[in-house]
Curated annotation (Swiss-Prot):
Its EC number is 1.1.1.38. NAD(+) binds at residues 154, 267, 415. GO terms for biological process: malate metabolic process. This is NAD-dependent malic enzyme. The record marks 267 as: Important for activity. One of its GO terms (cellular component) is cytosol. One of its GO terms (molecular function) is oxaloacetate decarboxylase activity.
Length: 562
Protein backbone atom coordinates (compact mmCIF):
# COMPACT_ATOMS: atom_id res chain seq x y z
CA UNK A 1 0.00 0.00 0.00
CA UNK A 2 1.28 3.42 -0.91
CA UNK A 3 -0.35 4.95 2.17
CA UNK A 4 1.87 2.69 4.32
CA UNK A 5 4.30 4.89 6.30
CA UNK A 6 7.02 2.25 6.37
CA UNK A 7 9.88 2.78 3.90
CA UNK A 8 10.21 0.77 0.72
CA UNK A 9 13.53 -0.97 0.19
CA UNK A 10 14.65 -0.51 -3.41
CA UNK A 11 17.52 -2.54 -4.95
CA UNK A 12 18.36 -0.31 -7.91
CA UNK A 13 19.23 3.32 -8.46
CA UNK A 14 20.06 6.10 -10.90
CA UNK A 15 18.36 6.20 -14.30
CA UNK A 16 16.92 2.70 -13.76
CA UNK A 17 14.94 3.94 -10.74
CA UNK A 18 13.73 7.02 -12.60
CA UNK A 19 12.67 4.84 -15.54
CA UNK A 20 10.34 2.75 -13.33
CA UNK A 21 6.90 4.44 -13.40
CA UNK A 22 5.66 2.74 -10.23
CA UNK A 23 8.63 4.05 -8.22
CA UNK A 24 9.71 7.26 -9.93
CA UNK A 25 9.14 10.44 -7.92
CA UNK A 26 10.81 12.86 -10.31
CA UNK A 27 11.54 16.16 -8.62
CA UNK A 28 10.03 14.86 -5.35
CA UNK A 29 13.00 12.62 -4.49
CA UNK A 30 14.36 13.94 -1.18
CA UNK A 31 17.98 15.06 -0.74
CA UNK A 32 18.66 11.85 1.21
CA UNK A 33 17.14 9.70 -1.54
CA UNK A 34 19.05 11.56 -4.24
CA UNK A 35 22.29 10.79 -2.42
CA UNK A 36 21.44 7.17 -1.62
CA UNK A 37 20.19 6.30 -5.10
CA UNK A 38 22.80 8.12 -7.22
CA UNK A 39 20.29 10.68 -8.46
CA UNK A 40 22.32 13.82 -7.73
CA UNK A 41 22.83 15.83 -10.88
CA UNK A 42 20.06 13.95 -12.68
CA UNK A 43 17.35 16.28 -11.36
CA UNK A 44 16.97 20.06 -10.88
CA UNK A 45 18.08 21.33 -7.48
CA UNK A 46 14.64 22.03 -6.01
CA UNK A 47 12.86 19.22 -4.18
CA UNK A 48 9.12 19.50 -4.71
CA UNK A 49 6.06 18.12 -2.96
CA UNK A 50 3.63 16.02 -4.94
CA UNK A 51 1.13 18.88 -4.80
CA UNK A 52 3.64 21.22 -6.42
CA UNK A 53 4.20 18.60 -9.12
CA UNK A 54 0.45 18.32 -9.63
CA UNK A 55 0.13 22.08 -10.07
CA UNK A 56 2.86 22.12 -12.73
CA UNK A 57 1.39 19.09 -14.50
CA UNK A 58 -2.09 20.62 -14.50
CA UNK A 59 -0.72 23.86 -15.91
CA UNK A 60 0.91 21.89 -18.71
CA UNK A 61 -2.26 19.87 -19.26
CA UNK A 62 -4.32 23.06 -19.68
CA UNK A 63 -1.91 24.30 -22.34
CA UNK A 64 -3.09 21.59 -24.75
CA UNK A 65 -6.13 22.52 -26.83
CA UNK A 66 -7.35 19.18 -28.18
CA UNK A 67 -8.65 16.30 -26.09
CA UNK A 68 -6.35 13.93 -27.98
CA UNK A 69 -3.28 15.98 -27.07
CA UNK A 70 -4.44 16.02 -23.44
CA UNK A 71 -4.88 12.23 -23.56
CA UNK A 72 -1.38 11.75 -24.95
CA UNK A 73 0.05 14.05 -22.28
CA UNK A 74 -1.67 12.18 -19.43
CA UNK A 75 -0.58 8.81 -20.82
CA UNK A 76 2.99 10.11 -20.91
CA UNK A 77 2.80 11.03 -17.22
CA UNK A 78 1.32 7.61 -16.47
CA UNK A 79 4.25 5.92 -18.21
CA UNK A 80 6.73 8.13 -16.34
CA UNK A 81 5.37 8.57 -12.80
CA UNK A 82 2.23 6.64 -11.88
CA UNK A 83 1.82 8.15 -8.43
CA UNK A 84 1.80 11.66 -9.89
CA UNK A 85 -0.59 10.57 -12.65
CA UNK A 86 -3.15 9.24 -10.19
CA UNK A 87 -2.88 12.21 -7.83
CA UNK A 88 -3.43 14.54 -10.80
CA UNK A 89 -6.42 12.56 -12.08
CA UNK A 90 -8.00 12.23 -8.63
CA UNK A 91 -7.67 15.98 -8.08
CA UNK A 92 -9.47 16.65 -11.39
CA UNK A 93 -11.56 13.49 -11.81
CA UNK A 94 -14.62 15.02 -13.51
CA UNK A 95 -12.47 16.96 -15.95
CA UNK A 96 -10.02 14.19 -16.77
CA UNK A 97 -12.14 11.02 -16.81
CA UNK A 98 -13.52 11.86 -20.29
CA UNK A 99 -9.91 12.34 -21.42
CA UNK A 100 -8.41 9.12 -20.07
CA UNK A 101 -11.50 7.08 -20.92
CA UNK A 102 -14.69 7.65 -22.92
CA UNK A 103 -15.13 9.45 -25.18
CA UNK A 104 -11.50 10.39 -25.95
CA UNK A 105 -10.16 6.86 -25.59
CA UNK A 106 -12.14 5.90 -28.70
CA UNK A 107 -10.08 8.21 -30.88
CA UNK A 108 -6.94 7.05 -29.07
CA UNK A 109 -7.75 3.45 -30.04
CA UNK A 110 -8.35 4.43 -33.66
CA UNK A 111 -4.98 6.20 -33.71
CA UNK A 112 -3.12 3.81 -31.39
CA UNK A 113 -0.27 2.98 -33.76
CA UNK A 114 0.15 6.61 -34.79
CA UNK A 115 0.42 7.99 -31.25
CA UNK A 116 2.34 5.03 -29.81
CA UNK A 117 5.18 6.12 -27.48
CA UNK A 118 5.91 3.27 -25.12
CA UNK A 119 4.68 -0.25 -24.51
CA UNK A 120 2.32 -0.86 -21.60
CA UNK A 121 0.82 -4.20 -20.62
CA UNK A 122 1.12 -7.31 -22.76
CA UNK A 123 0.49 -7.89 -26.46
CA UNK A 124 -0.17 -11.62 -26.85
CA UNK A 125 -0.31 -12.44 -30.56
CA UNK A 126 -1.61 -15.60 -32.18
CA UNK A 127 1.80 -16.46 -33.70
CA UNK A 128 3.09 -16.66 -30.09
CA UNK A 129 0.28 -18.97 -28.96
CA UNK A 130 2.76 -21.65 -27.85
CA UNK A 131 4.72 -19.20 -25.66
CA UNK A 132 2.00 -17.52 -23.58
CA UNK A 133 3.58 -18.63 -20.29
CA UNK A 134 6.83 -16.92 -21.29
CA UNK A 135 5.00 -13.74 -22.27
CA UNK A 136 3.17 -13.57 -18.94
CA UNK A 137 6.49 -13.95 -17.14
CA UNK A 138 7.71 -10.85 -19.01
CA UNK A 139 5.03 -8.61 -17.49
CA UNK A 140 6.39 -5.55 -15.69
CA UNK A 141 4.13 -6.21 -12.69
CA UNK A 142 4.65 -9.55 -10.99
CA UNK A 143 1.93 -9.62 -8.32
CA UNK A 144 -1.02 -9.18 -10.69
CA UNK A 145 -4.50 -9.25 -9.16
CA UNK A 146 -6.65 -7.59 -11.85
CA UNK A 147 -6.39 -8.18 -15.60
CA UNK A 148 -8.43 -6.40 -18.25
CA UNK A 149 -8.22 -8.22 -21.58
CA UNK A 150 -9.62 -7.47 -25.04
CA UNK A 151 -9.20 -8.85 -28.53
CA UNK A 152 -9.96 -5.44 -30.02
CA UNK A 153 -12.85 -6.58 -32.19
CA UNK A 154 -15.65 -4.38 -30.82
CA UNK A 155 -14.09 -1.25 -29.41
CA UNK A 156 -16.87 0.96 -28.02
CA UNK A 157 -19.07 1.71 -31.06
CA UNK A 158 -16.06 1.84 -33.37
CA UNK A 159 -15.75 -1.80 -34.36
CA UNK A 160 -12.56 -3.74 -35.06
CA UNK A 161 -9.45 -1.77 -34.07
CA UNK A 162 -7.03 -4.70 -33.77
CA UNK A 163 -4.29 -3.99 -31.24
CA UNK A 164 -5.53 -0.40 -31.08
CA UNK A 165 -8.04 -1.84 -28.65
CA UNK A 166 -5.26 -1.89 -26.04
CA UNK A 167 -6.32 1.65 -25.18
CA UNK A 168 -9.42 0.22 -23.52
CA UNK A 169 -7.71 -2.11 -20.99
CA UNK A 170 -5.21 0.65 -20.19
CA UNK A 171 -8.03 3.15 -19.63
CA UNK A 172 -10.19 0.72 -17.66
CA UNK A 173 -7.37 -0.19 -15.29
CA UNK A 174 -6.59 3.50 -14.82
CA UNK A 175 -10.14 3.83 -13.48
CA UNK A 176 -9.79 0.74 -11.28
CA UNK A 177 -7.02 2.68 -9.56
CA UNK A 178 -8.34 6.25 -9.74
CA UNK A 179 -11.89 5.31 -8.71
CA UNK A 180 -11.52 2.02 -6.86
CA UNK A 181 -8.18 2.41 -5.10
CA UNK A 182 -6.61 -0.72 -6.60
CA UNK A 183 -2.84 -0.35 -6.65
CA UNK A 184 -1.45 0.02 -10.18
CA UNK A 185 1.18 -2.54 -9.15
CA UNK A 186 -1.61 -5.15 -9.13
CA UNK A 187 -2.97 -4.40 -12.61
CA UNK A 188 -2.19 -5.70 -16.10
CA UNK A 189 -3.76 -4.65 -19.42
CA UNK A 190 -3.66 -7.31 -22.15
CA UNK A 191 -4.64 -7.41 -25.81
CA UNK A 192 -5.06 -10.75 -27.57
CA UNK A 193 -3.82 -10.02 -31.09
CA UNK A 194 -5.66 -12.48 -33.32
CA UNK A 195 -5.42 -10.25 -36.39
CA UNK A 196 -7.93 -7.73 -37.67
CA UNK A 197 -10.60 -7.58 -40.34
CA UNK A 198 -10.40 -3.79 -40.51
CA UNK A 199 -9.08 -2.99 -44.02
CA UNK A 200 -7.91 0.45 -42.89
CA UNK A 201 -5.69 -1.07 -40.23
CA UNK A 202 -4.33 -3.76 -42.55
CA UNK A 203 -3.49 -1.15 -45.19
CA UNK A 204 -1.97 1.33 -42.73
CA UNK A 205 1.86 1.18 -42.87
CA UNK A 206 1.91 2.46 -39.28
CA UNK A 207 -0.25 -0.38 -37.91
CA UNK A 208 1.77 -2.29 -35.32
CA UNK A 209 -0.36 -5.40 -34.88
CA UNK A 210 -0.32 -8.79 -36.60
CA UNK A 211 -1.27 -8.15 -40.23
CA UNK A 212 -3.61 -11.05 -40.77
CA UNK A 213 -7.38 -11.64 -41.03
CA UNK A 214 -8.90 -12.49 -37.66
CA UNK A 215 -8.54 -16.02 -36.39
CA UNK A 216 -12.00 -17.45 -35.75
CA UNK A 217 -13.81 -20.63 -34.77
CA UNK A 218 -12.06 -23.51 -32.98
CA UNK A 219 -8.61 -21.94 -33.48
CA UNK A 220 -9.77 -18.76 -31.72
CA UNK A 221 -11.41 -20.69 -28.89
CA UNK A 222 -8.27 -22.79 -28.37
CA UNK A 223 -6.12 -19.65 -28.25
CA UNK A 224 -8.32 -18.03 -25.60
CA UNK A 225 -8.38 -21.29 -23.63
CA UNK A 226 -4.58 -21.46 -23.63
CA UNK A 227 -4.45 -17.84 -22.48
CA UNK A 228 -6.85 -18.52 -19.59
CA UNK A 229 -4.93 -21.61 -18.52
CA UNK A 230 -1.63 -19.72 -18.65
CA UNK A 231 -3.06 -16.93 -16.46
CA UNK A 232 -4.32 -19.55 -14.01
CA UNK A 233 -0.83 -21.02 -13.79
CA UNK A 234 0.82 -17.61 -13.31
CA UNK A 235 -1.77 -15.77 -11.18
CA UNK A 236 -4.43 -18.27 -10.05
CA UNK A 237 -6.32 -15.73 -7.92
CA UNK A 238 -6.41 -12.88 -10.46
CA UNK A 239 -9.71 -11.27 -11.44
CA UNK A 240 -10.07 -11.27 -15.24
CA UNK A 241 -12.33 -8.68 -16.86
CA UNK A 242 -13.29 -9.39 -20.48
CA UNK A 243 -13.60 -6.15 -22.41
CA UNK A 244 -14.95 -5.21 -25.85
CA UNK A 245 -15.17 -8.67 -27.38
CA UNK A 246 -17.52 -8.97 -30.36
CA UNK A 247 -21.05 -10.14 -29.75
CA UNK A 248 -20.39 -13.59 -31.23
CA UNK A 249 -17.65 -14.20 -28.63
CA UNK A 250 -18.58 -12.07 -25.61
CA UNK A 251 -21.45 -14.11 -24.21
CA UNK A 252 -20.01 -17.56 -25.07
CA UNK A 253 -16.71 -16.67 -23.36
CA UNK A 254 -18.54 -15.43 -20.27
CA UNK A 255 -20.69 -18.57 -20.11
CA UNK A 256 -17.63 -20.78 -20.62
CA UNK A 257 -15.50 -19.25 -17.88
CA UNK A 258 -17.71 -17.58 -15.25
CA UNK A 259 -18.03 -20.77 -13.20
CA UNK A 260 -14.39 -21.82 -13.73
CA UNK A 261 -12.47 -18.67 -12.82
CA UNK A 262 -12.91 -15.30 -11.14
CA UNK A 263 -14.07 -13.23 -14.11
CA UNK A 264 -16.78 -11.00 -15.51
CA UNK A 265 -17.57 -9.15 -18.72
CA UNK A 266 -17.92 -5.45 -18.11
CA UNK A 267 -19.77 -4.75 -21.38
CA UNK A 268 -22.45 -7.28 -20.43
CA UNK A 269 -22.46 -7.42 -16.64
CA UNK A 270 -20.89 -4.10 -15.64
CA UNK A 271 -23.11 -2.15 -18.03
CA UNK A 272 -26.08 -4.10 -16.72
CA UNK A 273 -25.19 -3.42 -13.10
CA UNK A 274 -24.77 0.34 -13.50
CA UNK A 275 -27.94 0.56 -15.60
CA UNK A 276 -30.00 -1.36 -13.04
CA UNK A 277 -28.57 0.83 -10.28
CA UNK A 278 -29.51 3.96 -12.22
CA UNK A 279 -32.99 2.59 -12.96
CA UNK A 280 -33.56 1.76 -9.29
CA UNK A 281 -32.60 5.34 -8.43
CA UNK A 282 -34.87 6.72 -11.17
CA UNK A 283 -37.79 4.60 -9.98
CA UNK A 284 -37.31 5.77 -6.41
CA UNK A 285 -37.16 9.39 -7.59
CA UNK A 286 -40.39 8.85 -9.56
CA UNK A 287 -42.09 7.13 -6.61
CA UNK A 288 -42.46 3.73 -8.25
CA UNK A 289 -40.82 0.29 -8.51
CA UNK A 290 -38.80 -1.29 -11.29
CA UNK A 291 -41.19 -4.27 -11.42
CA UNK A 292 -44.00 -1.92 -12.49
CA UNK A 293 -42.13 -0.58 -15.53
CA UNK A 294 -42.52 -1.45 -19.22
CA UNK A 295 -39.05 -1.32 -20.70
CA UNK A 296 -37.98 -0.98 -24.34
CA UNK A 297 -34.44 -1.54 -25.58
CA UNK A 298 -33.03 -0.27 -28.84
CA UNK A 299 -30.15 -2.67 -29.44
CA UNK A 300 -30.40 -6.40 -28.79
CA UNK A 301 -26.74 -7.33 -28.74
CA UNK A 302 -24.92 -8.93 -25.85
CA UNK A 303 -24.83 -5.66 -23.87
CA UNK A 304 -28.53 -4.90 -24.32
CA UNK A 305 -29.58 -8.46 -23.55
CA UNK A 306 -27.28 -8.56 -20.54
CA UNK A 307 -28.91 -5.42 -19.16
CA UNK A 308 -32.36 -6.86 -19.85
CA UNK A 309 -31.60 -10.09 -17.97
CA UNK A 310 -30.28 -8.12 -14.98
CA UNK A 311 -33.41 -5.95 -14.97
CA UNK A 312 -35.61 -9.05 -15.12
CA UNK A 313 -33.73 -10.58 -12.18
CA UNK A 314 -34.29 -7.41 -10.14
CA UNK A 315 -37.98 -7.31 -11.11
CA UNK A 316 -38.39 -10.93 -9.99
CA UNK A 317 -36.68 -10.09 -6.69
CA UNK A 318 -39.42 -7.47 -6.18
CA UNK A 319 -42.09 -10.18 -6.28
CA UNK A 320 -43.32 -10.74 -9.85
CA UNK A 321 -42.84 -13.93 -11.86
CA UNK A 322 -40.09 -14.40 -14.42
CA UNK A 323 -42.71 -14.78 -17.18
CA UNK A 324 -44.43 -11.53 -16.16
CA UNK A 325 -41.12 -9.67 -16.02
CA UNK A 326 -40.14 -10.88 -19.50
CA UNK A 327 -43.51 -9.81 -20.90
CA UNK A 328 -42.68 -6.24 -19.81
CA UNK A 329 -39.35 -6.08 -21.68
CA UNK A 330 -39.31 -5.27 -25.40
CA UNK A 331 -36.11 -5.78 -27.39
CA UNK A 332 -35.84 -3.89 -30.69
CA UNK A 333 -32.97 -4.30 -33.15
CA UNK A 334 -32.45 -3.42 -36.81
CA UNK A 335 -35.17 -5.91 -37.82
CA UNK A 336 -37.68 -4.54 -35.32
CA UNK A 337 -39.16 -6.07 -32.17
CA UNK A 338 -37.71 -9.49 -31.33
CA UNK A 339 -40.60 -11.97 -31.52
CA UNK A 340 -40.86 -15.72 -31.18
CA UNK A 341 -40.18 -17.53 -34.43
CA UNK A 342 -37.80 -14.92 -35.85
CA UNK A 343 -34.89 -16.59 -37.70
CA UNK A 344 -31.17 -16.24 -36.93
CA UNK A 345 -31.54 -15.12 -33.33
CA UNK A 346 -28.72 -15.97 -30.94
CA UNK A 347 -29.42 -18.06 -27.86
CA UNK A 348 -29.32 -15.10 -25.48
CA UNK A 349 -31.74 -13.21 -27.74
CA UNK A 350 -34.19 -16.13 -27.87
CA UNK A 351 -34.77 -15.78 -24.13
CA UNK A 352 -36.04 -12.22 -24.64
CA UNK A 353 -38.47 -12.56 -27.55
CA UNK A 354 -42.04 -11.35 -27.15
CA UNK A 355 -44.78 -13.94 -27.53
CA UNK A 356 -47.21 -13.39 -30.40
CA UNK A 357 -50.04 -13.53 -27.88
CA UNK A 358 -48.67 -10.33 -26.34
CA UNK A 359 -48.62 -8.43 -29.64
CA UNK A 360 -51.57 -9.88 -31.59
CA UNK A 361 -53.70 -6.77 -31.00
CA UNK A 362 -50.93 -4.34 -31.91
CA UNK A 363 -51.15 -2.02 -34.89
CA UNK A 364 -48.19 -1.39 -37.19
CA UNK A 365 -47.32 0.29 -40.47
CA UNK A 366 -45.44 -2.58 -42.14
CA UNK A 367 -43.87 -5.95 -41.49
CA UNK A 368 -42.83 -6.47 -37.89
CA UNK A 369 -42.84 -3.71 -35.30
CA UNK A 370 -40.52 -0.71 -35.43
CA UNK A 371 -39.35 1.27 -32.41
CA UNK A 372 -42.15 3.76 -33.00
CA UNK A 373 -44.67 0.91 -33.26
CA UNK A 374 -43.49 -0.36 -29.87
CA UNK A 375 -43.84 3.13 -28.41
CA UNK A 376 -47.43 3.35 -29.62
CA UNK A 377 -48.52 -0.15 -28.61
CA UNK A 378 -46.49 -1.17 -25.55
CA UNK A 379 -46.52 2.34 -24.07
CA UNK A 380 -43.16 1.85 -22.31
CA UNK A 381 -42.11 3.88 -19.31
CA UNK A 382 -38.38 3.20 -19.78
CA UNK A 383 -36.36 3.52 -23.00
CA UNK A 384 -32.75 2.31 -23.13
CA UNK A 385 -30.43 2.76 -26.10
CA UNK A 386 -27.47 0.44 -26.68
CA UNK A 387 -27.57 0.44 -30.47
CA UNK A 388 -24.49 2.46 -31.36
CA UNK A 389 -26.69 4.18 -33.96
CA UNK A 390 -26.96 7.96 -33.47
CA UNK A 391 -30.23 9.85 -33.58
CA UNK A 392 -32.65 6.92 -33.44
CA UNK A 393 -34.42 8.32 -30.39
CA UNK A 394 -36.18 10.83 -32.62
CA UNK A 395 -38.48 13.62 -31.50
CA UNK A 396 -41.46 11.54 -32.69
CA UNK A 397 -40.33 8.54 -30.61
CA UNK A 398 -39.73 10.55 -27.42
CA UNK A 399 -42.92 12.59 -27.74
CA UNK A 400 -44.94 9.41 -28.33
CA UNK A 401 -43.45 7.97 -25.13
CA UNK A 402 -44.23 11.15 -23.21
CA UNK A 403 -47.90 11.00 -24.25
CA UNK A 404 -48.56 8.06 -21.95
CA UNK A 405 -45.80 8.52 -19.35
CA UNK A 406 -45.49 11.72 -17.34
CA UNK A 407 -41.92 11.03 -16.22
CA UNK A 408 -40.30 8.88 -18.91
CA UNK A 409 -36.96 7.31 -18.04
CA UNK A 410 -34.66 7.63 -21.06
CA UNK A 411 -31.13 6.23 -21.10
CA UNK A 412 -29.25 6.73 -24.42
CA UNK A 413 -26.19 4.72 -23.40
CA UNK A 414 -24.22 4.27 -26.63
CA UNK A 415 -20.58 5.37 -26.67
CA UNK A 416 -18.80 7.49 -27.76
CA UNK A 417 -20.76 10.76 -27.91
CA UNK A 418 -20.98 10.58 -31.70
CA UNK A 419 -23.03 7.36 -31.39
CA UNK A 420 -25.60 8.50 -28.83
CA UNK A 421 -29.26 7.78 -29.71
CA UNK A 422 -30.36 11.28 -28.63
CA UNK A 423 -28.78 14.15 -26.75
CA UNK A 424 -29.99 15.03 -23.25
CA UNK A 425 -30.76 18.54 -24.47
CA UNK A 426 -33.23 17.21 -27.03
CA UNK A 427 -34.81 14.70 -24.63
CA UNK A 428 -35.33 17.35 -21.94
CA UNK A 429 -36.75 19.79 -24.51
CA UNK A 430 -39.09 17.23 -26.13
CA UNK A 431 -40.51 16.21 -22.72
CA UNK A 432 -40.69 19.73 -21.30
CA UNK A 433 -38.15 18.85 -18.62
CA UNK A 434 -40.05 15.83 -17.28
CA UNK A 435 -37.77 13.00 -18.49
CA UNK A 436 -35.27 11.33 -16.19
CA UNK A 437 -32.10 11.05 -18.27
CA UNK A 438 -28.80 9.24 -17.96
CA UNK A 439 -26.26 8.80 -20.74
CA UNK A 440 -23.30 6.57 -21.51
CA UNK A 441 -20.97 9.46 -22.38
CA UNK A 442 -20.50 12.69 -20.42
CA UNK A 443 -22.78 15.63 -21.23
CA UNK A 444 -22.96 19.12 -19.76
CA UNK A 445 -26.00 20.05 -17.66
CA UNK A 446 -29.06 21.05 -19.69
CA UNK A 447 -30.74 24.41 -19.10
CA UNK A 448 -34.43 24.40 -20.03
CA UNK A 449 -36.80 27.26 -19.28
CA UNK A 450 -34.54 28.61 -16.58
CA UNK A 451 -33.99 25.29 -14.79
CA UNK A 452 -30.72 23.35 -14.82
CA UNK A 453 -30.84 19.58 -15.25
CA UNK A 454 -27.61 17.74 -14.30
CA UNK A 455 -27.11 14.72 -16.56
CA UNK A 456 -25.90 11.52 -14.92
CA UNK A 457 -23.32 9.57 -16.84
CA UNK A 458 -24.44 5.95 -16.56
CA UNK A 459 -20.83 4.90 -16.78
CA UNK A 460 -19.48 1.52 -15.76
CA UNK A 461 -16.80 3.35 -13.78
CA UNK A 462 -19.38 3.70 -11.02
CA UNK A 463 -19.51 -0.09 -10.76
CA UNK A 464 -16.46 -2.08 -11.84
CA UNK A 465 -13.88 -0.39 -9.56
CA UNK A 466 -16.02 -1.21 -6.53
CA UNK A 467 -16.53 -4.78 -7.74
CA UNK A 468 -12.78 -5.19 -8.16
CA UNK A 469 -12.07 -3.68 -4.74
CA UNK A 470 -14.60 -5.98 -3.09
CA UNK A 471 -13.21 -9.06 -4.83
CA UNK A 472 -9.64 -8.19 -3.84
CA UNK A 473 -10.53 -7.30 -0.25
CA UNK A 474 -11.80 -10.84 0.46
CA UNK A 475 -9.97 -12.72 -2.31
CA UNK A 476 -13.27 -13.88 -3.80
CA UNK A 477 -13.01 -16.90 -6.08
CA UNK A 478 -15.92 -15.98 -8.37
CA UNK A 479 -18.00 -13.00 -9.46
CA UNK A 480 -21.61 -14.18 -9.16
CA UNK A 481 -24.82 -12.69 -10.55
CA UNK A 482 -25.93 -12.02 -6.98
CA UNK A 483 -22.75 -10.05 -6.25
CA UNK A 484 -23.44 -7.90 -9.31
CA UNK A 485 -27.05 -7.33 -8.21
CA UNK A 486 -25.80 -6.13 -4.84
CA UNK A 487 -23.51 -3.65 -6.60
CA UNK A 488 -26.56 -2.19 -8.39
CA UNK A 489 -28.51 -1.83 -5.17
CA UNK A 490 -25.57 -0.21 -3.40
CA UNK A 491 -25.16 2.30 -6.23
CA UNK A 492 -28.86 3.21 -6.13
CA UNK A 493 -28.56 4.18 -2.46
CA UNK A 494 -26.00 6.83 -3.46
CA UNK A 495 -28.33 8.72 -5.85
CA UNK A 496 -28.75 12.42 -4.97
CA UNK A 497 -32.04 12.62 -6.90
CA UNK A 498 -33.48 9.59 -5.12
CA UNK A 499 -32.29 10.78 -1.71
CA UNK A 500 -32.95 14.52 -1.92
CA UNK A 501 -35.33 14.91 -4.86
CA UNK A 502 -32.81 17.06 -6.70
CA UNK A 503 -29.51 16.72 -8.51
CA UNK A 504 -28.44 13.97 -10.88
CA UNK A 505 -29.46 10.31 -10.82
CA UNK A 506 -25.91 9.34 -9.91
CA UNK A 507 -23.52 10.98 -7.44
CA UNK A 508 -20.78 13.33 -8.66
CA UNK A 509 -17.50 11.70 -9.61
CA UNK A 510 -15.86 13.59 -6.76
CA UNK A 511 -17.62 11.10 -4.45
CA UNK A 512 -16.51 8.03 -6.43
CA UNK A 513 -14.22 6.72 -3.66
CA UNK A 514 -17.11 6.59 -1.20
CA UNK A 515 -19.31 4.94 -3.83
CA UNK A 516 -16.65 2.35 -4.68
CA UNK A 517 -16.14 1.46 -1.01
CA UNK A 518 -19.89 1.09 -0.49
CA UNK A 519 -20.15 -1.19 -3.53
CA UNK A 520 -17.06 -3.12 -2.45
CA UNK A 521 -18.63 -3.82 0.94
CA UNK A 522 -21.90 -5.03 -0.61
CA UNK A 523 -20.12 -7.20 -3.18
CA UNK A 524 -17.70 -8.72 -0.67
CA UNK A 525 -20.46 -9.40 1.86
CA UNK A 526 -22.47 -11.26 -0.78
CA UNK A 527 -19.34 -13.22 -1.78
CA UNK A 528 -18.93 -14.32 1.83
CA UNK A 529 -22.63 -15.19 2.09
CA UNK A 530 -22.40 -17.35 -1.06
CA UNK A 531 -19.28 -19.15 0.09
CA UNK A 532 -16.92 -17.84 -2.59
CA UNK A 533 -14.86 -15.96 0.03
CA UNK A 534 -13.81 -16.73 3.60
CA UNK A 535 -16.15 -15.46 6.31
CA UNK A 536 -15.11 -12.36 8.27
CA UNK A 537 -16.99 -9.85 10.42
CA UNK A 538 -18.39 -6.62 8.99
CA UNK A 539 -15.79 -4.68 10.97
CA UNK A 540 -12.98 -6.82 9.57
CA UNK A 541 -14.44 -6.40 6.07
CA UNK A 542 -14.42 -2.61 6.35
CA UNK A 543 -10.82 -2.80 7.58
CA UNK A 544 -9.89 -5.08 4.66
CA UNK A 545 -11.38 -2.63 2.16
CA UNK A 546 -9.55 0.30 3.76
CA UNK A 547 -6.29 -1.67 3.77
CA UNK A 548 -6.71 -2.59 0.11
CA UNK A 549 -7.45 0.99 -0.94
CA UNK A 550 -4.30 2.48 -2.49
CA UNK A 551 -3.61 6.21 -2.27
CA UNK A 552 -1.29 8.14 -4.62
CA UNK A 553 1.26 9.36 -2.08
CA UNK A 554 5.04 8.95 -2.13
CA UNK A 555 6.62 6.52 0.32
CA UNK A 556 10.12 6.90 1.72
CA UNK A 557 12.76 4.80 -0.03
CA UNK A 558 15.72 3.01 1.50
CA UNK A 559 18.39 1.41 -0.62
CA UNK A 560 19.13 -2.28 -0.37
CA UNK A 561 21.37 -4.65 -2.28
CA UNK A 562 20.04 -7.08 -4.88
Amino acid sequence: MNNDKRPLYIPYAGPALMATPLLNKGSAFSAEERSSFNLEGLLPETTETIQEQVERAYQQYKSFESDMDKHIYLRNIQDTNETLFYRLVQNHISEMMPIIYTPTVGAACENFSNIYRRGRGLFISYPNRDRIDDLLNNAANHNVKVIVVTDGERILGLGDQGIGGMGIPIGKLSLYTACGGISPAYTLPIVLDVGTNNPQRLADPMYMGWRHPRITGPDYDAFVEEFIQAVQRRWPDALIQFEDFAQKNAMPLLERYKDRICCFNDDIQGTAAVTVGSLLAACKAAGTQLSKQRITFLGAGSAGCGIAEAIIAQMVSEGISDEKARSQVYMVDRWGLLQEGMPNLLDFQQRLVQKHSNTKEWENEGNGFSLLDVMRNAKPTVLIGVSGAPGLFSQEVIEEMHKHCKRPIVFPLSNPTSRVEATPNDIIRWTNGEALVATGSPFDPVVHEGRTYPIAQCNNSYIFPGIGLGVLAVNAKRVTDEMLMESSRALATCSPLAINGRGALLPPLEEIHLVSKKIAFAVAKKAIEQGVALEITDEALNDAIDQAFWQPVYRRYKRTAF
